[in-house]
Amino acid sequence: MARKCVVTGRQTRSGNQRSHAMNSNKRNWKANVQKVRIMVDGKPKKVYVSARALKSGKVERV
């Protein structure tokens, strides 16, 4: 399964890593997603949720 938050849609982003000489290398920044149990349509379900969504209270654990 992809590293994607089902609440906020946060996922892996790509970009350049720059050295002091400004050489560029491609790299990825991965979202901090955790597998948690939440209520989905009245039933508990395990889904991937970002840590930011958990901290801000957008979802509540079961």
Curated annotation (Swiss-Prot):
The keyword Isomerase does not apply. SUPFAM superfamilies: L28p-like (SSF143800). One of its GO terms (biological process) is translation. Residues 1-27 are annotated as: Disordered. Transmembrane segments: none annotated. Keywords: Ribonucleoprotein, Ribosomal protein. GO terms for cellular component: ribonucleoprotein complex; ribosome. Residues 9-26 have a biased composition (Polar residues). Signal peptide: none annotated. GO terms for molecular function: structural constituent of ribosome. PANTHER family: 50S RIBOSOMAL PROTEIN L28 (PTHR39080), LARGE RIBOSOMAL SUBUNIT PROTEIN BL28A (PTHR39080:SF1). HAMAP family: Ribosomal_bL28. Belongs to the bacterial ribosomal protein bL28 family. This is Large ribosomal subunit protein bL28.
